[in-house]
Amino acid sequence: MTDEEQNSLLNILSDEHTRNILQETMKEPMSADELSEACDISPQSVYRRTDPLTEHGLLDARMEYDADGHHYRTYTADPTQIVVEITAEDINVAISQQERMTDRFIEFVNHVRNQ
């Protein structure tokens, strides 16, 4: 990760509402309206925070459709852990991502099919 990317990520994570969005979406996938209610911020504020989180790979956005055919996005936090290491020489930000059970199952099925 470049210094510019690290600085951008640290800036994003310095916001309390952004951290709340990450925590809420670690529990379960949530729409912007659900996040608005859970984090006590406007839907516009949710979008202002989910866009950079998605760009940095910290949130996964997925399109969902309701029974009436209307579409909306749900967000799921991707990182398992974000570690900031500060030394006298450098600052490093590391993101470790948990392999999801569904991803492991799909990989297993594909492996079985190829044999």
What do these predicted ranges mean?
Residues 57-58, 63:
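Glycine-centered, phosphate/nucleic-acid-interacting loop/turn motifs that mediate DNA/RNA or nucleotide
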